[in-house]
Amino acid sequence: MLEISARLEEALNRAFTKVFPQEDRSSKTSSILTGSNLVPASKPEFGDFQINCALSLAKEINRPPRDIAQQIAKQLQQDNDFVRICNPPLIAGPGFINLSINSKTLISEIHFRLNDKRLGVPLKKFNTDKIEEEKSNNRVIIDFSSPNIAKEMHVGHLRSTIIGDSLARVLEFCGYEVLRLNHVGDWGTQFGMLITHLKEVVPEVLHTKDVVEISDLVNFYRQAKKRFDEDQIFQNKSRSEVVNLQAGDKESLIAWQLLCNQSRKEFQKIYDRLDIKLTERGESFYNKFLVDVINDLKNKKLLINDQGAQCIFLDGLVGKDGKPQPIIIQKSDGGFNYATTDLAAIKYRLTIPPHGDGACRLIYVTDAGQASHFSGVFQIAKLANWIPTDCQIEHVPFGLVQGEDGKKLKTRSGETIRLVDLLDEAIQRARDDLKNRLNTESRSENENFIDKVSTTVGIASIKYADLSQNRISNYQFSFDKMLSLQGNTAPYLLYALVRIAGISRKGGDLNVSSQNIQFNESQEWDLIRKLLQLDSIIAEVEKELLPNRLCGYLFELSQTFNRFYDQVPILKASEPSRASRLVLCSITADTLKLGMSLLGIPTLERM
C-alpha cells in the first residue's frame, strides 16, 4: 500500500495546513506536523492506518486532543483525494484517528495486481543526470559466503551464504544492479605449508596435463597442518614457499592454482544445491593494490610506525588492558594482513571503472564477531576519503547457529558440522517424513516425485529456518521444528501453495477474468489487505536488510489464506463469488512464489 499511504500523507499534510496555518505554528508544532504521523494500524480492528499526533499537539497548543482530532478529520473529509481512497475517519480513545481504505480502492488495487508481474512493488527509479560516466548510483556490491580455500564449508558459512543471497535477490528485484562477490580466502601463509606438502606427497600433479583429484582436501589440510606444527624443517620450507609464491614462482603458482581449483569444485557443489549465484574474487585479486594502499595512507599521514609496523590508531579503540590498540596495516616484516586486503577491496569497489567497480553501496554479510574489524576498516576508509559522500558502506552482522541445548552447533564429537552433511540430513529427514505420510494416507508416488519433494522441502526448510530469524540474534537449529507442517516453517508456506494448486487441479481456473469481482466476507477482505502489504514489506527489507521481515509476512499471508480456504467455499460458491475467490487464490499463489523466490526458496505444487 505504498502508493495509497503516500497519497494519504499528502492529504493529511493538506489538512494540517488548513488546521494549523504555517504562520501560527511554533517550532515544536512544526516538528510534530512534519514527522511521520500516518502509521499502519496497530490492530486490524483499528482499520488500516492511524493518525496519533493529536495527543502530542494537545500538550503544545493546550487544547483537548479529541478536539484537535475532530478538526483534522473534518478537513480530511473535505479532501477529494482522501474521500476517493478512504471511508470517513473514526476518532477513538483520547484522540486517535483511525482510517480504513474503502472497498472500491481495495478492489481497484486487486485488479491492478492481477495484471502486474511485480504485484504492485514499484521498480526503483535512479537519478542518472549527475552521475559521472561509468559510475552508477544503483550499483550495489554484496560481499558474502567467503569460505577459505582447502577447507570445507561448514554450518557457519550457511548464514552468510543464504542471507547474502536473499538480500541480493531483494535488491535486484527493487531495481539495483547487484554484484555478488565471494571474497574467498585464497591467499596467505597457510598456502606455504599446503604447497610444500603437495610437492612432497603428490609431486606428479605439478607436471601432468590430466586433472588430478585430491580426494580429501580437508584431510590433506590437516596433514599439512600437523607437519607444520611438529616438524621444524617442514615449517622452514613452508615459510620459504610463501616467499616463492609471493614472488610469482611458476611451480608454486601451479600448486596454488590446483589447490584453489579443487576447493572451487567442492564449493560449487554446495552453491548449486542451494541455488546460489556468486562471482568469485578472492583475497589474491587485491595483492597488486596493497602497496598503493600503504602509500596513499602514508601520504595522508595516517600511518604511525609502531615497533617497525605501520599502524593506525583510532579514537576509542583500546585493548583489554585499556591501552590504545593499533590496527596493523603492514607488519614489521613487510607483510600484509586482512585489514590491508579489506581496505584495498573497499578502495577498488568504490573507484570508478575501469580502475574499480564504481559501486554506490557496499554490504558485508559476516558473523557479528567481525563487527569490530569492519568498524575499524570502515573508519580508516573514511579518514582516507575513499568513501564518496553519496555512497553507503555497511556491515550486516548475524548471530550463531546453536544446537537445541543453546550451545554452538557441533557434531557429537565436538567438531564443526560440515554444510554438506547438514543438507544431506535435512533431505533424508524430509524423505522419511514424506514416506511416513504417504503410508498413512495410503498414497503411492514414484521415486522421482519422492526425490523432488524431499530435496525441495529439505533445502527450503534449512533456508527458511535461518532466514525467518532476526539475523542479529543467535538461533537454535532444530530439524523437527523446521520440517514441521505447523508454525512459521517452509513446509507450512509450501502447503498453502499446494492447496492453491489443488484448487486449480480440481477445475478452478486461476486465470479467470477480473471484470466483475466482488467481496462480501470478512475473510476475503482480510486476505486482500494482507496481499496489499507486499510492497511495503519489500521496502522494509531493502532499507533494514532484514529478510525475516519478508518471512514473517509470508507466514502471516499463509495463515490468512488458510483461514479463508477453511471458512469460505471457493469452487462450490456461486458466481460472481466463485470467480472473485479464484482471483484471490491466484494473487496469493503469485505473492507466495515471488516472496519465496526473493528468499531463494524453491516451491512445489504437490507434496
Swiss-Prot record:
GO BP annotations listed:
arginyl-tRNA aminoacylation
Q: Which reaction does it catalyse?
A: tRNA(Arg) + L-arginine + ATP = L-arginyl-tRNA(Arg) + AMP + diphosphate
Q: Quote any Pfam family the record assigns.
A: Arg_tRNA_synt_N
The sequence motif named 'HIGH' region is recorded at 147-157
- The gene from which this protein is expressed is argS
| Assembly notes | Monomer.
Where in the sequence is the signal peptide annotated?
none
Instruction: Please give the name of this protein.
Output: Arginine--tRNA ligase
Q: Does the keyword Electron transport apply?
A: no
Entry's EC annotation: 6.1.1.19
Return the broad EC class.
ligase
NCBIfam families from the UniProt entry: argS
